[in-house]
């Protein structure tokens, strides 16, 4: 019989260097999509002390003031003061963007299926790269997400609100959280075992003050009291000091927080990051579609926990494989579920773009606090509008 076990997930704040990079990349993507919904975008960002570097490939008819977008994004996050070692008005911004490779474009613009004479318009777009993507859902939270990750994200959102509203005046933008949850033998979360939270702060505040404020105004405000007990361990700023942070403390890079962005380590990951990529890149769009499928199958009652994998060949519209793992919790066979998925969901890139309406500027809001399980923003892949259709097929 399975025994109780612990599982840990982490999140980082919007002021974390890697997340600054993600938000800049997605802010540029949104600015381009606003003017040109067909823009092909693959934008990477790196940030370090006093410098933001934007590089990658773009094909578009739109003009966007990239420098302005970068600076505004940095300031919105909260880097507005030179003493942070990085601020939106005074940092250097270097832009080095090229056009998308014509070799890639020919396979994306006209898929293998179109080149072989098929006429379905949704076959038009070939996958922007090969790769494998995963979607996951679990019924352990109302968001259909793992509890340790949901709590970690909520801690980070809470501390950002307290900072931006100046409730706790000494807070600076960089922060990280990690939550360990204890599960019973049936896999049900029963308590929070450990909370780790590190936050950047002004130099003139005591560690005792930070620990008291964070415990009362952040942790206890976010984590339901029934999960906390006298055995719960708290590590708040355990190094003792966190004044130097953000890009001054560590260089940041787009796509380096892919587990924070997805399922907190509770599911597989195909390795492809999301931010800065338009929806012809299946790293992003197929991961969103896979989450949409997994969430609707779990919500429909066909599994308590489910993971789906899809895989693509570059320049080919149809996925090369679809597989499902219901971890022994399924009420239907995995083969039956895959057959239903093929009927209900179109997993060709153009089909995903149409199904989820992905040629819109909706991406910057996903670039911090997770792409999945969000209740604070309206995301099409979080909708449960396929439950009835799945029930009609699967019974």
Swiss-Prot record:
Gene Ontology cellular component list: cytoplasm
Binding note for cofactor: Binds 2 divalent ions per subunit.
Primary location class: cytoplasm
Transmembrane segments: none
Keyword Nucleotide-binding applies: yes
Positions bound to ATP: 16, 174-176, 241-242, 250, 256-257, 273, 277
Binding residues annotated for L-methionine, in chain numbering: 57, 100, 250, 281
Record GO terms (molecular function): ATP binding; magnesium ion binding; methionine adenosyltransferase activity
Cofactor(s) this protein cannot do without: Mg(2+); K(+)
Catalytic activity entry: L-methionine + ATP + H2O = S-adenosyl-L-methionine + phosphate + diphosphate
Domain of life, per lineage: Bacteria
The protein's Enzyme Commission number: 2.5.1.6
Protein role: Catalyzes the formation of S-adenosylmethionine (AdoMet) from methionine and ATP. The overall synthetic reaction is composed of two sequential steps, AdoMet formation and the subsequent tripolyphosphate hydrolysis which occurs prior to release of AdoMet from the enzyme.
Cited HAMAP family: S_AdoMet_synth1
Recorded family membership: Belongs to the AdoMet synthase family.
The name this protein goes by in its record: S-adenosylmethionine synthase
Organism: Limosilactobacillus fermentum (strain NBRC 3956 / LMG 18251) (Lactobacillus fermentum)
């Amino acid at each position: 019989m399975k025994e109780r076990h612990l599982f840990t997930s982490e999140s980082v704040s919007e002021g974390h260097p890697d997340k600054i990079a993600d938000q800049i990349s997605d802010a540029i993507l949104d600015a381009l999509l606003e003017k040109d919904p067909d823009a092909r975008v693959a934008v990477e960002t790196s940030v370090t002390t006093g410098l933001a570097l934007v590089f990658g490939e773009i094909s578009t008819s739109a003009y966007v003031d990239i420098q302005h977008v970068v600076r505004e994004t940095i300031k919105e996050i909260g880097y507005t003061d030179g003493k942070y070692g990085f601020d939106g008005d005074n940092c250097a911004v270097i832009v080095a963007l090229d056009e998308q490779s014509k070799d890639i474009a020919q396979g994306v613009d006209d898929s293998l299926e179109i080149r072989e004479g098929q006429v379905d318009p949704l076959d038009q777009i070939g996958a922007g790269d090969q790769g494998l993507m995963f979607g996951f859902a679990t019924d352990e939270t109302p968001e259909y997400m793992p509890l340790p990750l949901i709590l970690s994200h909520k801690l980070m959102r809470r501390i950002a609100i307290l900072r931006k509203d100046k409730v706790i005046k000494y807070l600076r933008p960089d922060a990280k959280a990690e939550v360990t949850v204890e599960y019973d033998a049936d896999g049900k979360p029963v308590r929070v075992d450990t909370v780790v939270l590190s936050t950047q702060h002004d130099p003139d505040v005591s560690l005792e003050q930070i620990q008291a404020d964070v415990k009362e105004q952040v942790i206890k405000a976010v984590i339901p009291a029934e999960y906390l007990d006298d055995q719960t361990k708290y590590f708040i700023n355990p190094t003792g000091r966190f004044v130097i942070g953000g890009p001054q403390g560590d260089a940041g890079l787009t796509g380096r927080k892919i587990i924070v962005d997805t399922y907190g380590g509770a599911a597989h990951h195909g390795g492809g990051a999301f931010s800065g990529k338009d929806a012809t890149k299946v790293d992003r769009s197929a991961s969103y579609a896979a989450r949409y499928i997994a969430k609707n199958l779990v919500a429909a009652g066909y599994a308590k926990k489910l993971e789906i994998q899809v895989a693509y060949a570059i320049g080919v519209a149809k996925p090369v494989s679809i597989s499902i793992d219901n971890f022994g919790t399924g009420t239907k066979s995995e083969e039956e579920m895959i057959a239903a998925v093929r009927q209900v969901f179109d997993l060709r890139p153009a089909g995903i773009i149409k199904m989820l309406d992905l040629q819109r500027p909706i991406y910057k809001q996903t670039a911090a606090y997770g792409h999945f399980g969000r209740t604070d923003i309206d995301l099409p892949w979080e909708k449960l509008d396929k439950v009835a259709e799945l029930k009609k097929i699967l019974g």
